[in-house]
Amino acid sequence: MAIATINPTTGQTIKTFDSLTDAQVDQKLQKAIDTFRSFRKLSFADRARMMVRAAEILESEKDSLAHLMTLEMGKTLRSAVDEAVKCAWACRYYAEHAEKFLADEQVETPASRSFIRYQPMGVILVIMPWNYPFWQVFRFIAPGLMAGNVGVLKHASNVPQCALKIEEVLVKAGFPEGAFQTLLIGSGQVDRILDDPRVAAATLTGSEGAGVQVGSGAAKRIKKVVLELGGSDPFIVMPSANLEEAITVGIKARVINNGQSCIAAKRFIVADQIADKFQHEFVAQMEKLKLGDPFDEKTDVGPLANAEAVTSLQADVSASVKAGAKVLTGGKPANLPGSFYLPTVLVDIPKDSPAYREELFGPVASIFRVKNADEAIRVANDSRFGLGASAWTNDKAEQERFINELEAGMVFINQMVFSDPRVPFGGVKRSGVGRELSTYGIREFTNVKTVWVK
């Protein structure tokens, strides 16, 4: 099987790679487990030196790394530069804090000594998507390797050069060659790797369907798995909110990464008394967005990742319109070469339509009108997903209600949802299990050992 990387801006094939054979995968898994036996014994200080060096490389090479990201998956160049810098931040954060996060925890018991020790699990299968081709991977690398684990990466098939470059950065930073290896393979080979006794656990960021497959595969083998899946994040705007700011941030939250982010705002839930003004200005700002070449500094929205993404998004929009939704702007692919979709706003959305029930992955905003906070919470929670939620209100009582009652792993008040190494990232319901980042993220891939000395 060949793995081709295609420029979504032009539709042209950039490069083609051969998939690894089963024998080649076996060699890499053996190299990983052999490396783990020595890598786990390194001190936190030794691993931190490598991680800081990785951060320095990410920062010094941010422009070339950004160019590669934009070339392979179409994010705007300036956002790709930001992504490289954010990866460096995560590396530095865990280099500084990993030892503290995983320090022995003393427990008061009748024993002469009793404590909890966190130890690395081993070889982790890392399955990552294309939408943040560096950041999604470094969200595992920084905590995972600082904890003493090693990783094998099955990256999305449309970003193979990004995957190989990540491995190159780590080797250049001084990590052993077996500490983090890229597997250029198809999805059909994943279950075999998950079944391999040398693989201790898995982490996946991806679709709900992929999560079900990998999660059930891990369960069959009694292996730990962390799943960060889809989101249909609500963006609630109440009468007391700063409306101008909410609209400006809402636009950014919807079209970030060309609308292809699990934590992008997708369902705009707006109080009736401000809905007309919100809707009018929101549509006006969406229509002003510049769609085009992601290498152009003036571009706001680049292409979707591939032609299949355009087809899927158009199918969801068309089905929603057929069910009764109205298009206020956009609603179709752009008349441009490549995989472009017009910034779109939908209203009057029926409950049985994709715009209500599914995660629309692209620059499509769905607006819902509600009477009050009660209805806003009900509509927001009427989803099988529960990743992030953003609520805009200056009413303290409403803020507390949203914090307590929204069914989401992350609730941001008067701010768009984003990831930050200092706080846990993850969702509830069908948005996944486990957490990434923060203290919680680094402990996900450790064995928690109870020690009791009489």
Segments (PLM) and residue ranges:
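N-terminal Rossmann-like NAD(P)+-binding subdomain of aldehyde/semialdehyde dehydrogenases
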Residues: 1-113
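ALDH superfamily catalytic-core signature
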Residues: 14, 209-350, 373, 413
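Rossmann-like NAD(P) dinucleotide-binding subdomain of oxidoreductase/dehydrogenase enzymes
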Residues: 103, 107-245, 370
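Short, flexible turn/loop "capping" segments at secondary-structure junctions
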Residues: 5-9, 29-30, 226-229, 257-262, ...
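Structural signal for hydrophobic packing residues in well-ordered secondary-structure cores
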Residues: 36, 40, 55-62, 66, ...
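Residues at or immediately preceding the N-termini of alpha-helices
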Residues: 8, 22-25, 44, 62, ...
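Conserved C-terminal structural/oligomerization subdomain of aldehyde/semialdehyde dehydrogenase
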Residues: 10-16, 199, 236, 290, ...
